[in-house]
Amino acid sequence: MKPKDPFATSGLPPINQPEQENNRALEDVREIDSKYLILVADDSADSAAMISLYLQHQGYRVLTAANGEDAIKIASSTFPNLILMDISMPTLDGLGATRRIREDETLRDIPIIAVTAFGTEGFQRAAYDVGVSGYLTKPIDLDRMCNLIAHLLSPTGSGSLPS
């Protein structure tokens, strides 16, 4: 006959239950996030790769474009949930691409985050004037980027930051 374990807690959840719940919650968040497709438009292959890998690690699906023209073409065929748009790109820069996306009936509501090395107030104003939903300066603070993305994709985010 096996002796009764004095530390057994019959009917009680295991001690590691909170950790299991946290892991389950994290899996739920990643499952929810994975339905979101983010387009990263950046002519720097290194920047695009770094941002893409980080977003994929966070559970997002990611596509990339090397210039504004490609970003518009990809957005038109895939309808991403959000676009991270570098401002200084060849062929068509991020401001021009954002302007054209905002003029397109089928794309205009996609949140666009401007990503640039230019942090001046005038440059930021120009980006908001063409319709960006958020603004990040390089080097990118990845936590801030993820918080901004989460806000813009949330039901209350409505594609723009609160004033």
Which residue ranges define each predicted feature?
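Active-site beta3 strand of CheY-like receiver
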Residues: 78-84
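Charged docking surfaces used in two-component/phosphorelay signaling
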Residues: 49-57
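Receiver (REC) domain active-site loop signature in two-component systems and cognate sites
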Residues: 89
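Short, glycine/charged-rich "phosphate-handling" switch motifs in NTP-dependent
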Residues: 133
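Non-catalytic signal-transmission and effector/linker regions of two-component phosphorelay proteins
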Residues: 1-37, 143-163
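Short hydrophobic/Thr-rich beta-strand motif most characteristic of the beta2 strand and flanking loop
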Residues: 59-66, 74, 136
